[in-house]
From Swiss-Prot:
It comes from Histophilus somni (strain 2336) (Haemophilus somnus). InterPro entries: Aa-tRNA-synt_II (IPR004364), aa-tRNA-synth_II (IPR006195), aa-tRNA-synth_II/BPL/LPL (IPR045864), Asn-tRNA-ligase (IPR004522), Asp/Asn-tRNA-synth_IIb (IPR002312), NA-bd_OB-fold (IPR012340), NA-bd_OB_tRNA (IPR004365). It catalyses: tRNA(Asn) + L-asparagine + ATP = L-asparaginyl-tRNA(Asn) + AMP + diphosphate + H(+). Its EC number is 6.1.1.22. Homodimer. This is Asparagine--tRNA ligase. Belongs to the class-II aminoacyl-tRNA synthetase family. NCBIfam families: asnS, PRK03932.1. Keywords: Aminoacyl-tRNA synthetase, ATP-binding, Cytoplasm, Ligase, Nucleotide-binding, Protein biosynthesis. The keyword Protease does not apply. GO terms for molecular function: asparagine-tRNA ligase activity; ATP binding; nucleic acid binding. It is found in: Cytoplasm.
Length: 467
């Protein structure tokens, strides 16, 4: 049986010239010459570039099938790897046999025809868009980043923990959660006071899709010392922007016996590790993004890796913004949550490097963040990156039960809803810290693709849950 080879392995020189192999993939283009030859560009998704197959007109099905091949048809090609006389490719496939696996019904109406399509159009055909150069490249980069994240944490001695997607806790205390229910909406059970009786629901209480795996992750960090979660999270935030998704993936490490400084160091090490990985492993895709999407993609990643992170207190960041002379769209004052324009000014113009902003006002941060000695700020941090702004948000967690209880009450939350979280402070509490990295936002940064809807396979946004 002939060896099956990926296009990536052939183009990387892992297949010897003169070897006969079988390539399975799809037609990107077909070009015919007057000399009785056809040139097929075949891709299989294993890398950015297709391989060229040279087809002689003496192949058995040349007239009946080869000359009918169009963009999108699937083929199985067996032939010999030969050196290519053409520029831009070291080798090509001299076809001996071609089987057509699948035809395109109507090439005239095929949504992924060889012409260039707008990114907006591609969202309407999300089931077919991975066949395009841009979305195929995004998918490979996404895979590379995910694998690098897992490798990084494994090498650092972390354990991956699967936290629940269905929860009764609101980690952020923002209330923007999707309710999970099996109740009949046309015949809802009611309490004596007329409220919906969730005790009759599937879980016996009000339940939601998770907004974060952090609280559950903390329980495992307080036993295994170093853990991380990596999975989907959900926000019922009615935001139609290029930065928001209703369903997205989060990376959330949690470290016991750790301070905010330890947290910031972990964030820096992780980001630099995964950026090195993508530069080493996906050069072909990054060159495409550099040429067609954002000319600074590769330079930005290299600069990030070679930069020392600046560190600054929130209060000092506010002073810098006030003294900048910039007319910001959102006015600056102590107590505001920094907007994207503020973050990008700090990272791109003032420091010209990644920045860790820390010790934020407690009133704009979540209940679980450790209260500082000044009583006004919490041990929170945001990592700001040139070109995007906030890329990571984290904190040292509040390990003191009495302080945590006070914060829960201040936020208008119910202590009984967090009984198990409070237990972590009652039984062998330790200082601990962690952060959250929005995985899709990381991909936006790495690829230069502007809209977050284009870096997740099937985006979920307000009034859009197609496919």
């Amino acid at each position: 049986m002939t060896k099956i080879a990926s296009v990536a392995n052939i183009l990387k020189g892992k297949i010897t010239v003169g070897e006969t192999v079988t390539v399975r993939g799809w037609i990107r283009t077909r070009r015919d010459s007057k000399a009785g030859l056809s040139f097929l560009a075949i891709y299989d998704g294993s890398c950015f570039d297709p391989i060229q197959a040279i087809v002689n007109n003496d192949i058995e099905n040349y007239e009946t099938e080869i000359l009918r091949l169009t963009t999108g048809c699937s083929v199985v090609v067996t032939g010999k790897i030969v050196e290519s006389p053409a520029e831009g490719q070291a080798v090509e496939l001299q076809a001996d046999k071609i089987e057509v696996s699948g035809w395109v019904d109507d090439p005239e109406t095929y949504p992924m025809s060889a012409k260039r399509h707008s990114i907006e159009y591609l969202r309407e055909v999300a089931h077919l868009r991975p066949r395009t150069n841009i979305i195929g490249a995004v998918a490979r980069v996404r895979h590379c980043l995910a694998q690098a994240i897992h490798r990084f944490f494994h090498e650092q001695g972390f354990y991956w923990v699967a936290t629940p997607l269905i929860t009764a806790s609101d980690t952020e205390g923002a209330g923007e959660m999707f309710r999970v229910s099996t109740l009949d909406l046309e015949n809802l059970p009611r309490t004596d006071k007329g409220a919906v009786d969730f005790s009759q629901d599937f879980f016996g209480k009000e339940s939601f899709l998770t907004v974060s795996g952090q609280l559950n992750g903390e329980s495992y960090a307080c036993a295994l010392s170093k853990i991380y979660t990596f999975g989907p999270t959900f926000r019922a935030e009615n935001s139609n922007t290029t930065r928001h998704l209703a369903e997205f993936w989060m990376v959330e490490p949690e470290i016991a016996f750790a301070t905010l400084a330890d947290n910031a160091k972990l964030a820096e090490d992780m980001l630099k590790y995964v950026f090195r990985a993508v530069l080493n492993e996906r050069e072909d895709d990054l060159k495409f993004f550099e040429k067609h999407v954002d000319k600074n993609v590769i330079t930005r990643l290299k600069d990030f890796i070679n930069s020392d992170f600046a560190q600054i207190d929130y209060t000092d960041a506010i002073d810098i913004l006030l003294k900048s002379g910039k007319a910001f769209e959102f006015p600056v004052s102590w107590g505001i949550d920094l907007s994207s324009e503020h973050e990008r000014y700090l990272a791109e113009e003032y420091f010209k490097s990644p920045v860790v902003v820390k010790n934020y006002p407690k009133d704009i941060k979540a209940f679980y963040m450790r209260l500082n000695d000044d009583g006004k700020t919490v041990a929170a941090m945001d990592v700001l990156a040139p070109g995007i702004g906030e890329i990571i948000g984290g904190s040292q967690r509040e390990e003191r039960l009495e302080v945590l209880d006070k914060r829960i009450a201040e936020m208008g939350l119910k202590a009984e809803d967090y009984w198990w979280y409070r237990d972590l402070r009652r039984y062998g509490t330790v200082p601990h810290a962690g952060f959250g990295l929005g995985f899709e936002r990381l991909i936006v940064y790495v690829t230069g693709v502007q809209n977050i809807r284009d870096v997740i396979p099937f985006p979920r946004t307000p009034r859009n849950a197609n496919f």
